[in-house]
């Protein structure tokens, strides 16, 4: 009589940006090579991986709370392995502090050595606890693993790190200086993903617009987009994040000319005041940013623009804040990701005078959200009566009886439809809208 071996289960939790999600997928795939299968049930897991974020204090507090919650699972199942990785662990001096706070964790890894996770997991299984954080990246290595194989949508790293050093941002300190992947490696990964069923890729980098500046040949982000656009079987190409100072006319024209390059640009402006932009070390002015927006709208008239905004940066006056609100009204973003400034240890902004009180930051954030919600609603209401191409992603989270997907402009659409439409491109007539969602009726499918 043969005994069927029950596979071990891994649950991976990702916090923070899309790059953190991509790293979490990589860690999951590495675990699968050790025989683990993906699961969503923490109580049944044999391995729990938490890939962390440290961009804002609120994110860190949420992660620390989750790590604390895992302690009772470890007590109930001493064979359970818990691994914590990513940006929070990579911060200078963080490892010792975190290990003292969470002695139940088995594996600690930073951002530079996630491709070493199989070795770390083996060491933890054989010897017990292991902690390894590389101070600097030793190589630009992207695993051949297809971290998102079989998925409709995938994130693909094109570069790592950042050279901009915005004064509020911890990312260059935990991700290192900018390193571009070789284009052949990126294109090979995307082609392989398409073979497994992927139809949309999002190219990731802290600043995709500066991709290629460290390569040994003249090859920039626009060149990469052209090559990705030509891959057979790929329906959509997105990218993030773009730094305004590096957004060239060549890049805008490439997006406009592309077949599969989505008419959506995420272009963070962060603040509408030149004084605050200077303090942030953003390396552009309000006027320059608006000139880039104007050029985008001329070359890509149907473009959907999204952005990131920070309120309450040190020294921000009411006049500075009003300039931010005015810029929002002028540009008309379809969506904005809004945040209160969060002091990050080790960044120049953390040492600046005139730190803004929390109550003022909260008030400004609420004002900002109110203004942007009105802009988002107006943008979406203008789409009522139009027919949009939608990539169907799955059941709606708010109403499982309906399907959901996104337009090329990244607008979320909810509509009635059968499950067999998932993974296809359909035409949806937009009939209603709120500030966040379009509602419609499926008229035809393309693929």
Swiss-Prot record:
* Known partners and oligomeric status: Monomer.
- Provide the TRAM domain boundaries: 381-444
By what name is this protein known?
A: tRNA-2-methylthio-N(6)-dimethylallyladenosine synthase
E.C. designation(s): 2.8.4.3
Q: Which cofactor does it need?
A: [4Fe-4S] cluster
Q: Where's the MTTase N-terminal domain?
A: 8-126
One Pfam family for this entry, by name? UPF0004
Per its UniProt record, what Gene3D superfamilies does this chain match? Methylthiotransferase, N-terminal domain, tm_1862 like domain
Name the PANTHER family for this protein: CDK5 REGULATORY SUBUNIT-ASSOCIATED PROTEIN 1, MITOCHONDRIAL TRNA METHYLTHIOTRANSFERASE CDK5RAP1
Q: In terms of domain of life, where is this protein from?
A: Bacteria
Species in which this protein is naturally found: Desulfitobacterium hafniense (strain Y51)
The UniProt record gives the binding positions of [4Fe-4S] cluster 2 as: 162, 166, 169
Extract the InterPro entries matched here.
Elp3/MiaA/NifB-like_rSAM (IPR006638), Methylthiotransferase (IPR005839), Methylthiotransferase_CS (IPR020612), Methylthiotransferase_N (IPR013848), Methylthiotransferase_N_sf (IPR038135), MiaB_methiolase (IPR006463), rSAM (IPR007197), rSAM_horseshoe (IPR023404)
Keywords assigned: 4Fe-4S, Cytoplasm, Iron, Iron-sulfur, Metal-binding, S-adenosyl-L-methionine, Transferase, tRNA processing
Radical SAM core domain boundaries: 148-378
Q: Which GO terms describe its cellular component?
A: cytosol
Role summary: Catalyzes the methylthiolation of N6-(dimethylallyl)adenosine (i(6)A), leading to the formation of 2-methylthio-N6-(dimethylallyl)adenosine (ms(2)i(6)A) at position 37 in tRNAs that read codons beginning with uridine.
Q: Which residues bind [4Fe-4S] cluster 1?
A: 17, 53, 87
Q: Which family does it belong to?
A: Belongs to the methylthiotransferase family. MiaB subfamily.
Reactions the enzyme catalyzes: N(6)-dimethylallyladenosine(37) in tRNA + (sulfur carrier)-SH + AH2 + 2 S-adenosyl-L-methionine = 2-methylsulfanyl-N(6)-dimethylallyladenosine(37) in tRNA + (sulfur carrier)-H + 5'-deoxyadenosine + L-methionine + A + S-adenosyl-L-homocysteine + 2 H(+)
Q: What binding details are noted for the cofactor?
A: Binds 2 [4Fe-4S] clusters. One cluster is coordinated with 3 cysteines and an exchangeable S-adenosyl-L-methionine.
């Amino acid at each position: 009589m043969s005994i069927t071996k029950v596979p071990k289960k891994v649950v991976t939790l990702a916090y923070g940006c899309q790059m953190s999600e991509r790293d979490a997928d990589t860690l999951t795939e590495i675990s699968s090579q050790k025989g683990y299968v993906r699961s969503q049930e923490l109580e049944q897991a044999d391995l729990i991986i938490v890939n962390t974020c440290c961009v804002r204090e609120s994110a860190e507090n949420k992660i620390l709370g989750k790590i604390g919650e895992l302690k009772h699972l470890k007590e109930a199942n001493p064979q359970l392995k818990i691994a914590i990785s990513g940006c929070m662990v990579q911060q200078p001096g963080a490892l010792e502090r975190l290990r003292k706070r969470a002695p139940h964790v088995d594996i600690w890894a930073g951002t530079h050595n996630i491709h070493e996770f199989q070795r770390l997991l083996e060491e933890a299984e054989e010897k017990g606890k292991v902690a390894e954080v590389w101070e600097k990246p030793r190589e630009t290595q992207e695993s051949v693993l297809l971290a998102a194989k079989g998925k409709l949508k995938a994130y693909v790293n094109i570069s790592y790190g950042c050279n901009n050093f915005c004064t509020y941002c911890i990312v260059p300190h935990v991700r290192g200086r900018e390193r571009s992947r070789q284009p052949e490696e990126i294109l090979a990964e995307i082609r392989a993903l398409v073979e497994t069923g992927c139809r949309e890729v999002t190219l990731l980098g802290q600043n995709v617009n500066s991709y290629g500046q460290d390569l040994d040949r003249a090859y920039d982000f626009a060149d990469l987009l052209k090559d990705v656009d030509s891959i057979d079987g790929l329906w959509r190409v997105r990218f993030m994040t773009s730094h305004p100072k590096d957004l060239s006319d060549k890049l805008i024209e490439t997006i406009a000319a592309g077949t599969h390059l989505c008419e959506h640009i995420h272009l963070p402006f962060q603040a509408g005041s030149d004084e605050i932009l200077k303090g942030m070390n953003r390396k552009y002015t309000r006027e320059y940013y608006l000139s880039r927006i104007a050029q985008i709208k001329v070359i890509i008239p149907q473009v959907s623009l999204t952005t990131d905004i920070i309120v309450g940066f040190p020294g921000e006056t009411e006049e500075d804040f009003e300039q931010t609100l005015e810029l929002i009204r002028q540009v008309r973003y379809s969506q904005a990701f809004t945040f209160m400034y969060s002091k990050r240890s080790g960044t120049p902004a953390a040492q600046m005078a005139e730190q803004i009180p929390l109550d003022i930051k909260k008030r400004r954030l609420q004002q900002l959200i109110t203004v942007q919600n009105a802009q988002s609603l107006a943008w979406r209401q203008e789409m009522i009566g139009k027919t949009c191409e939608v990539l169907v992603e799955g059941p709606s989270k708010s109403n499982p009886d309906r399907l959901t997907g996104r337009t090329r402009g990244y607008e979320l659409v909810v509509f009635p439809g059968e499950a067999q439409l998932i993974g296809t491109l359909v035409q949806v007539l937009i009939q209603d809208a709120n500030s966040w969602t379009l509602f419609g009726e499926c008229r035809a499918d393309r693929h």
